[in-house]
Amino acid sequence: MNCLNEINSEGFVVIEDVFSGEEIKKIILEIEKITSSEVENSTFRKSEDLFAIRQFHKEVPESLKFIFNSNLLKIIKSIKGEGSFITKSIYFDKPEKSNWFVSYHQDLTISVNKKIESENFKNWTVKQNQYSVQPPVSILDSAFTVRIHLDKTTKENGALKVLNGTHKNGVIRVENIDSKNEVETICEVGEGGV
């Protein structure tokens, strides 16, 4: 499975059926085990419009054996080879009737376990006891995001919108994004796709 050409050209790729229905059920079950208690957790965010878990891989570690199945491992290897590791993981559950909109943006930060002032690492923040920082462009260029779909995502219920090829333009300030002159793709993905 080699999706590198499409990623290099467009900046993204949609791959269906990475996870079976049974694997999705197991991932959801692990999430439900953790979230069913009423215990407050600083990495959980819950409102009418959103439920989120920051540091997902630390909060729901039992899910990792289902997430890193042979299909996903092949995809990761085809993109980056050996040695990839998690720098950030967030779980979002957006209720069907919520009107939650995410504007165009670039993921510019990575999570780190402590703050060490270093050249070209900037815009430090702390969210739910987790440090985040914008690393140098060379590190950003070597990172990639995997968005795992636990249910079908369409343009009506929150599919990711991307501007094709803009990853080649480096870091772009939000006010400089000219979406009218870019090709937009709405990434509709079925349950179990990435």
Q: Can you annotate each of these PLM segments?
A:
Residues 2-10, 19-191:
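Non-heme Fe(II) oxygenase catalytic core, chiefly the N-lobe of the double-stranded beta-helix
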